[in-house]
Amino acid sequence: LLRRRRGLLDGVVLTGGEALRQDALADAAREVIDMGFQVGVHTAGPYPRRLRDMIEAGLVSWVGLDIKALPEHYGQVVGRANAAARAWESLEVLVEAAGRGGPDFEVRTTVVPGDVTADDAVEVARRVHAAGARVYALQQARSEGTSGEFDVVAPGWDGMCERMAERIEALGWDRFTYRPA
């Protein structure tokens, strides 16, 4: 399939539940690169060492990193011990690599109405910016493809998200994107 796409595509983004969890990711990235494509990775950052290894091996040219909440609220959002430390360490890995000419990256936060993600969004963006990231996206959660166990709409929610986006954009990013639902 990819061989037929040469000249039509610039790259392939490896994603899934968590791309970096896959033991064969580095080998898959090498194959994609050998076919002449760039490689991107979507991650929530639970494997900072594996991310560093991929970067140092030259196997990734772009990363989309989800930072879900402030460190003190991460467990509430993802329900896993050490998730905050690992995600924020992955951000450090990306910032350090970018300082050495490493891959481009985007940090994004997805917000859900009535959830700590919405309460934290502007402060998360401030801390991400202070850490050295320069490309950021605020995303409204969407119901498509979910179990329906949480509400992604609420009265006034769109307006709240637009105001969050304005405050976050004002932090001075090289590129800021707001992705409404």
Model regions and ranges:
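Short acidic, glycine/proline-enriched helix-loop-strand junctions
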Residues: 87, 100-105, 146-181
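Conserved strand-to-loop "acid loop" that flanks and positions the catalytic carboxylate
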Residues: 17
